[in-house]
Amino acid sequence: MSMRSEYCGLVTEELLGQSVSLCGWVSRRRDHGGVIFIDLRDREGLVQVVCDPDRAEMFKAAEGVRNEFCLQIKGVVRARPEGTTNAALKSGKIEVLCHELIVLNPSITPPFQLDDDNLSETTRLTHRVLDLRRPQMQHNLRLRYRVAIEVRKYLDAQGFIDIETPMLTKSTPEGARDYLVPSRTNPGQFFALPQSPQLFKQLLMVANFDRYYQIVKCFRDEDLRADRQPEFTQIDCETSFLSEQEIRDLFEAMIRHVFKETIGVTLDEKFPVMLYSEAMRRFGSDKPDLRVKLEFTDLTDAVRDVDFKVFSTPANTKDGRVAAIRVPKGGELSRGDIDSYTEFVRIYGAKGLAWIKVNEVAKGRDGLQSPIVKNLHDEAVKAIIERTGAQDGDIIFFAADRAKVVNDSLGALRLKIGHSEFGKANGLVESGWKPLWVIDFPMFEYDEEDNRYVAAHHPFTSPKDEHLEYLETDPARCLAKAYDMVLNGWEIGGGSVRIHREEVQSKVFRALKINAEEAQAKFGFLLDALQYGAPPHGGIAFGLDRIVTMMAGADSIRDVIAFPKTQRAQCLLTQAPSEVDERQLRELHIRLRQPEPKA
């Protein structure tokens, strides 16, 4: 006979009067007047088990049961007495009268209660196996599974083929640092773990597989930010003979399908499309959160000749910018609030935060309250009020600096105010889901330290057709056929049309100061393949971890990954990374150099 006939959480009134065999863990044990109640838990939920003292041997076993004991229960399903049902449980109308109780494995006392919502992340990750038993973690990982299923369903229906690409590959040090794997059989040589399957999926297009996908692990040895992992999972896709618009339409439909089928959310029938330049101008970010209703107003040209040097200096600097955000009803904010926001923007490099409270627009400058108004001439004041659309009771915040500092600091302030209690109370943020595409990214960014251009996306992204000439004459003007899908302020997917002609790829390498010899050494296999009739192709990669985090409403991507790393790229459960013994190092022809002692 099978050890289990039903899952605990699926025992309902349909099984009334039937004998069942259940397996699971003790969530709670209660002794009520000589009758023992056990909440037995498995992955499907809870069921209440009643242990009556009439069965002496079974009852004695039940008396010794404690939380997290692993049990097998045999008994009969019966209705709960009137007034004791639990509407929160699928099994809440029934209970199981226990006839036989077998302790499959006892448990030592857990280091925490599974229903404790105030556990530190260190505790949770150190005892991850127990943490994963908690209902929320069970829910999150099953949601992740369902997302993966729906992705596969959609892509299979669209003719995509799941093809695995190598985990041990060639190091191509462009972008983030690679994780290196020493080769024992080739002393002094190393594999790299892939940052993405980028080049292999392009080669698959050249090889006539037409449509490829893979749900794949990727690795980046980068300085970890708040919500990054050294290993992460991509929904990686590539397709041939489609235009940029067709690629976006195809994968927009995939995301709509996944959201509808997994969490019942209907996303916009057509996602809005925004140029990168517009996103930076209006929101200071290439991943704008469209739920927040605040926008930038550019004032650079209006304050070039004011006496206020904080404004006029960046306004007359090549890469300077002066911008503002108007906060409706922001006049209610206290000086303490303003000081707090001032300290907040300093995190992003701003030197301070100028502001004007608009008490009465009709009175002109006399209706404004601010320490900076006296340093602004009438034309500048008029431009500020008119361009921002300021009304009585508003406040206007300003940032003036290099464009990057303005965008970063004012963009962060926009989100902070929008999502604050003040913002919610005053309708500055909407609920729900706000997807969009951001397109036409710069092809290159200039690296001041290395004194050269670097690829803004990656060096295999195609320039826009009309910008091909700029590759050799003015790379800064060159825009790429690149696109990001943004949802509620997070980039959830990014891709591009790829370069499919060898001569164009070589021009891009030259623009990046990668000479022909270096290009052949690093990417010769790609350049060779492009000469064999490579088709036009493009693709996209979605961050599975990020998508599931948003769907689950989780605080961190670590809450949707079974065994994540910490911000220091450590696994607290297994204590990885760890030292290895000298013999292993000798086999790999590696000698460790001890770090220099600190002075």
Swiss-Prot record:
Site feature Important for tRNA non-discrimination, where: 32, 83
Reaction catalyzed: tRNA(Asx) + L-aspartate + ATP = L-aspartyl-tRNA(Asx) + AMP + diphosphate
Region (Aspartate): 198-201
Binding site for ATP: 220-222, 229, 491, 543-546
Keyword Transcription: no
Short name of one Pfam family: tRNA-synt_2
InterPro entries for the chain: Aa-tRNA-synt_II, aa-tRNA-synth_II, aa-tRNA-synth_II/BPL/LPL, Asp-tRNA-ligase_1, Asp-tRNA-ligase_1_N, Asp/Asn-tRNA-synth_IIb, AspRS_core, GAD-like_sf
EC number: 6.1.1.23
Keyword field: Aminoacyl-tRNA synthetase, ATP-binding, Cytoplasm, Ligase, Nucleotide-binding, Protein biosynthesis
GO BP, one annotated term: aspartyl-tRNA aminoacylation
Keyword Ligase: yes
Family under the similarity heading: Belongs to the class-II aminoacyl-tRNA synthetase family. Type 1 subfamily.
Organism for this UniProt entry: Paraburkholderia xenovorans (strain LB400)
PANTHER family: ASPARTATE--TRNA LIGASE, MITOCHONDRIAL (PTHR22594:SF5), ASPARTYL/LYSYL-TRNA SYNTHETASE (PTHR22594)
Function (record text): Aspartyl-tRNA synthetase with relaxed tRNA specificity since it is able to aspartylate not only its cognate tRNA(Asp) but also tRNA(Asn). Reaction proceeds in two steps: L-aspartate is first activated by ATP to form Asp-AMP and then transferred to the acceptor end of tRNA(Asp/Asn).
Organism taxonomic ancestry: Bacteria, Pseudomonadati, Pseudomonadota, Betaproteobacteria, Burkholderiales
Assembly mode: Homodimer.
Binding site for L-aspartate: 174, 220, 457, 498
GO MF entry, a single one: ATP binding
Protein name as catalogued: Aspartate--tRNA(Asp/Asn) ligase
Subcellular location as annotated: Cytoplasm
Gene Ontology, cellular component aspect: cytoplasm
